[in-house]
C-alpha cells in the first residue's frame, strides 16, 4: 500500500482488526502476494518489495490460500465471462470457492454473480 493511498486509513484499520483477532476467518489469495511483488518489481523498488512481502506474510490471523488448479480454472472462466484481469479473477475465484465474500474497494467484483463485496471503507466507519 502506498503511503499516500486514499484507502490507507481503512486498510490500516482492517489489518489491525485481523492482527488483533477482532476480525476472524479472514483469508487472502496468495495471488495477492504475487500482485504486490509485480507492483514493486515493475517500479524497481526491491528493498521495499522485501519489506512489503515480509510484512504481509507475517500478519497474524490471516490465512493465505494457495492457488489450486480449481481456483485457476475458475479464474479463467471468470476472465472470459466478466472481462476481469487475472489477479481480480484469482481473488474472485478464491472467494467463490470459500465463502463467496470479498473485502475490496473495487467495484469490479459487484458484477460477478455469487460474490458479496464488503467495502473496507464501511468497516472503517463502524465503531
PLM features: what roles do these ranges have?
Residues 3, 27-32, 60-80:
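Acidic catalytic patch
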Residues 32, 71, 91, 108-109:
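Alpha-helix capping/helix-boundary segments
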Residues 86-87:
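Alpha-helical solenoid repeat architecture
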Amino acid at each position: 500500500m502506498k503511503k499516500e493511498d486514499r484507502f490507507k486509513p481503512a486498510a490500516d484499520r482492517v489489518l489491525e482488526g485481523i492482527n488483533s483477532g477482532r476480525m476472524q476467518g479472514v483469508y487472502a489469495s496468495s495471488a495477492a502476494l504475487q500482485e504486490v511483488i509485480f507492483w514493486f518489481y515493475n517500479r524497481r523498488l526491491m528493498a521495499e518489495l522485501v519489506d512489503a512481502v515480509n510484512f504481509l506474510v507475517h500478519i497474524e490471523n490471516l490465512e493465505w490460500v494457495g492457488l489450486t488448479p480449481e481456483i485457476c480454472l475458475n479464474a479463467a472462466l471468470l476472465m472470459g465471462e466478466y472481462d476481469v484481469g487475472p489477479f481480480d479473477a484469482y481473488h474472485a475465484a478464491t472467494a467463490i470457492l470459500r465463502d463467496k465474500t470479498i473485502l475490496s474497494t473495487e467495484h469490479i467484483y459487484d458484477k460477478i454473480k455469487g460474490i458479496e463485496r464488503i467495502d473496507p471503507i464501511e468497516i472503517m466507519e463502524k465503531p
